[in-house]
């Protein structure tokens, strides 16, 4: 199904009914609204103006639209900030952030918790049983604009309490953090400060605990709202819209309190921000990288335990990337179908009409500010017609499982040991290779059940907890583990048995030395798939296992014991492709090399093919299959769907 984000408070009331009628005529079923409307609902303290929202919801019901109502807590009004200035967050440089944007609150603020409880309870009590309201979105894009980690006095006190609960005694904390180093020993939890503004780098264990604490604070704030909504809005779903390429919080943990996950898909903006070579950014400037949206669909399907929405889908140029090109004709339709192929229950577009004012006036919508339709309007009209004629089977399991860990991103942010080491870059490289091989990927948190997958990929897992080791030991298929896995304990220390730590139960080897390589300094390796150049990262390994791939100086780079493999370097694109292709063939997954820009996705017996490229491509469909959308020749920025039994 399809939906759209709408802001009735931005438009004259006489437009509302006309807009809702146009939404239904377009084929939209859902409308999200209200997530930034606190000042419109309560312009002065206690003076609640529900009337306009009452009328909006009644009109939506009349026109057959289902409403996802946002809690308005991402934008506390000016009067609230003036009354409680301490709710404003403090940045890493110790500066109090000002009113005038959005997300201007601290998750640890007691005053803001109280005000949140008041407005959310009032909203849920009034609309939790309204027939138009089918669900709630909690807040909006937790952590956007760098707001997960705050450095205010409230956070300091909350962090001290978090540490007391975790460690019990200050001696336990000192041992865990190794505070004997640089004379950092604490006598009491009340002496612990937030890890910022230090002369030299802060203690990495201190930083990691603070990152964990900050993520936990967001989760607690979300759960706090969820509980209020559950109490007052029976039978309504609750979700939150996560972001792309964002690791400051743990989405798997937060989503445990939601009915499903949602995310905001802006393929062009994300591609412009990705650490890609400039030629690739130009190549995909109007389409988005072929794997950027798919990666997040699969990630948030995993986060949502099999269920996800796209709450905001890009319909035109955005306003927040360094460069903001317009999508190529056909791409809004392609992105929509791709989300559906990956299992999205709803694709909702941002926004119905481009705002003529304020910060997002340069961000396109379905309609221009003069009320005339934009290009995306007609592409979505076509999708709605196609959807009505194409029954969709349930999405099944993929053949490849990938283990994703936000904590790993935190570890490498704190201690990268090399400027080019980026966790998400490594993860995305693995994911993208399997997409180029025509294979689907399911994404899991560490410790999730991995049975039934022919191939399990762990790009890097520095902290290997007991449940993660158990899940890997019980996996049915081949398991490939990437560099720096098992390199730290939960306390952010080198494990006593040295890396890969607990993974030595599966892979009897020791990483005895590591190095990071600057750009241009390359090592060469050779093996059964050819000769490859390596950069970024290398490890020296002691083991009795024979290496499958060697550096030219004799050091091993790839080791195997039974079903388990360890990769002791940052893989070059060429090696990664050859390795993953070989493992997929061994696992019986039938990989195939797709033309550049072509991607496949199965949904039950349906096979979707998406052409991100500028040329016509041939659909890799068996002879005689029936095409349900398109045909064997797929034009640029188009798709085809066929059925395979």
Swiss-Prot record:
Binding site for Zn(2+): 106, 150, 152, 155
GO terms of molecular function: beta-galactosidase activity; metal ion binding
Superkingdom assignment: Bacteria
InterPro entries: Beta_galactosidase_C, Beta_galactosidase_Trimer, Class_I_gatase-like, Glyco_hydro_42, Glyco_hydro_42_N, Glyco_hydro_b, Glycoside_hydrolase_SF
SUPFAM superfamilies cross-referenced by the UniProt entry: (Trans)glycosidases, Class I glutamine amidotransferase-like, Glycosyl hydrolase domain
Keyword set, alphabetical order: Glycosidase, Hydrolase, Metal-binding, Zinc
Gene Ontology BP, a term: galactose metabolic process
Family named by the database record: Belongs to the glycosyl hydrolase 42 family.
Protein's UniProt name: Beta-galactosidase BgaA
Taxonomic lineage from the root: Bacteria, Thermotogati, Deinococcota, Deinococci, Thermales
């Amino acid at each position: 199904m399809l939906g759209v984000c709408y802001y009735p408070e931005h438009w004259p009331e006489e437009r509302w009914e006309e807009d809702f009628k146009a939404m239904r005529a377009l084929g939209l079923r859902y409308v999200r609204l209200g997530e930034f409307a606190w000042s419109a609902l309560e312009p002065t303290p206690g003076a609640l103006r529900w009337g306009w929202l009452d009328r909006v919801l009644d009109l939506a019901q009349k026109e057959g639209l289902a409403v996802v109502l946002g809690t308005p807590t991402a934008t506390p009004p000016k009067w609230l900030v003036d009354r409680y200035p301490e709710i404003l967050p403090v940045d890493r440089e110790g500066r109090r952030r000002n009113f005038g944007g959005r997300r201007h609150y601290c998750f640890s603020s007691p005053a803001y918790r109280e005000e949140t409880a008041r407005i959310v309870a009032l909203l849920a009590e009034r609309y939790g049983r309204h027939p138009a309201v089918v669900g709630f979105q909690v807040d909006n894009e937790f952590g956007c604009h760098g707001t997960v980690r705050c450095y205010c006095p409230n956070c300091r006190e909350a962090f001290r309490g978090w540490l007391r609960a975790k460690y019990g005694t200050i001696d336990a904390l000192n041992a865990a953090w190794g505070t004997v180093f640089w004379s950092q020993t604490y006598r009491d939890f009340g002496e612990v400060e937030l890890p910022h503004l230090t002369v030299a780098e802060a203690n990495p264990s201190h930083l990691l605990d603070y990152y964990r604490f900050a993520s936990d604070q967001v989760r607690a704030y979300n759960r706090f709202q969820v509980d209020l909504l559950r109490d007052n809005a029976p039978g309504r779903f609750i979700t939150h819209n996560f972001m792309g390429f964002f690791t400051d919080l743990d989405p798997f943990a937060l989503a445990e309190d939601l009915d499903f996950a949602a995310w905001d898909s802006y393929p062009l903006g994300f591609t412009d921000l990705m650490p890609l070579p400039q030629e690739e950014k130009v190549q995909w400037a109007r389409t988005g990288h072929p794997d950027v949206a798919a990666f997040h669909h699969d990630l948030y399907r995993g986060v949502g335990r099999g269920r996800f929405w796209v709450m905001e889908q890009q319909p035109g140029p955005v306003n927040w990337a360094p460069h903001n090109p317009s999508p190529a004709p056909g791409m809004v339709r392609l992105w929509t179908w791709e989300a559906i192929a990956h299992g999205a229950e709803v694709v909702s577009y941002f926004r119905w009409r481009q705002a003529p004012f304020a910060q997002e006036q340069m961000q396109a919508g379905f309609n221009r500010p003069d009320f005339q339709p934009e290009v995306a309007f007609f592409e979505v009209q076509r999708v709605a017609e196609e959807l009505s004629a194409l029954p969709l089977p349930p999405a099944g399991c993929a053949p490849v499982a990938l283990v994703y860990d936000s904590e790993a991103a935190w570890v490498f942010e704190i201690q990268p040991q090399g400027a080019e080491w980026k966790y998400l870059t490594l993860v995305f490289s693995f994911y993208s290779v399997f997409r180029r091989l025509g294979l689907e990927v399911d994404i899991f948190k560490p410790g999730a059940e991995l049975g039934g997958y022919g191939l399990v990929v762990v790009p890097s897992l520095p902290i290997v907890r007991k449940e993660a080791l158990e899940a890997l030991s019980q996996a049915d298929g081949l398991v490939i583990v990437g560099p720096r896995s098992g390199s730290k304990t939960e306390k952010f220390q080198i494990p006593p048995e040295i890396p890969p730590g607990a993974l030595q139960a599966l892979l009897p080897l020791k990483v005895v030395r590591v190095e990071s390589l600057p750009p241009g300094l390359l090592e060469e390796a050779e093996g059964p798939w050819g000769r490859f150049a390596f950069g970024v990262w290398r490890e020296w390994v002691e083991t009795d296992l024979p290496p499958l791939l060697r550096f030219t100086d004799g050091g091993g780079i790839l080791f195997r014991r039974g079903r388990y493999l360890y990769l002791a370097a940052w893989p070059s694109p060429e090696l990664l492709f050859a390795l993953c292709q070989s493992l997929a063939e061994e696992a019986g997954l039938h990989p195939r090399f797709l033309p550049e820009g072509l991607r496949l996705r199965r949904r039950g017996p349906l096979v979707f093919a998406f052409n991100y490229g500028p040329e016509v491509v041939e659909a890799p469909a068996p002879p005689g299959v029936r095409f349900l959308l398109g045909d064997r020749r797929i034009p640029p920025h188009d798709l085809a769907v066929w059925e395979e039994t």
